[in-house]
């Protein structure tokens, strides 16, 4: 298993993508291949992103679902080294100067993914939003080389038992430097 996405509720769409992809609210990002490796040398940072969309909003057709809020929970043996952030969309009225080149992703005013906020334990996200959870593992010297699972679970925040809505599993490999 490298990357596995399990959708248990009809109104959620999830997609793993690399950390450099800009995930716009109105455009489906390029998916990370199921067999793609998330890896780094020990002491380096390894990153990936999880794009999420509720109600099939913008990523496809969907319908209104009964849940209003979902809790996001991250589990991993390397959790002490894991930094999970939410990428917030911010408005931009001046995206590019009139005289610009081809190096811009977009030129028109709108919402742009820019602001990183720390995702706290059991963070609650609204079904009215779409966005990105960005995961970075700082593979410090204390993190032993090896392959570690990272599981990101979305559960219904309104139910006491927290019905699982979706789950994403990926593997992160920390490589030992070889001389």
Q: PLM ranges: what are they?
A:
Residues 163-179:
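An acidic-aromatic substrate-binding cleft motif
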Residues 2-32, 56-135:
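Surface-exposed binding patches on compact interaction domains or structured appendages
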Residues 50, 146-158:
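A short beta-strand micro-motif common to beta-rich folds, especially ectodomain repeats
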Residues 55, 157-159, 177:
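Short coil/turn motifs at secondary-structure junctions
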Residues 33-60:
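Contiguous beta-strand segments within globular domains
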Residues 40-45, 127-132, 145, 177:
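Solvent-exposed, conformationally flexible loop/turn segments
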Residues 48, 70, 133-136, 150-152, ...:
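Hydrophobic residues positioned within well-ordered beta-strands of beta-sheet architectures
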Residues 57, 138-145:
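Short, surface-exposed loop/turn segments at beta-strand-coil junctions that are enriched for proline
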């Amino acid at each position: 298993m490298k990357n596995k996405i399990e959708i248990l509720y009809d109104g959620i769409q999830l997609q793993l993508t690399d950390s450099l992809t800009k995930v716009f609210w109105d455009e489906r990002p390029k998916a990370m291949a199921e067999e793609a490796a998330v890896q780094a040398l020990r002491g380096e940072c390894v990153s990936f992103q999880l794009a999420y969309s509720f109600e099939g909003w913008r990523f496809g057709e969907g319908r209104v679902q009964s849940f209003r809020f979902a809790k996001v929970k991250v589990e991993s043996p390397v959790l002490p080294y894991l930094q999970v952030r939410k990428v917030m969309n911010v408005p931009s009225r001046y995206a590019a100067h009139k005289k610009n080149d081809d190096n811009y992703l977009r030129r028109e005013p709108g919402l742009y993914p820019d602001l990183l906020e720390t995702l706290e334990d059991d963070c609650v996200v609204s079904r009215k939003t779409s966005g990105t959870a960005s995961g970075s593992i700082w593979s410090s010297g204390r993190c032993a080389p090896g392959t570690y699972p990272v599981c990101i679970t979305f559960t219904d925040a309104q139910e006491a038992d927290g019905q699982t809505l979706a789950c994403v599993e990926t593997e992160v490999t920390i490589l030992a430097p070889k001389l």
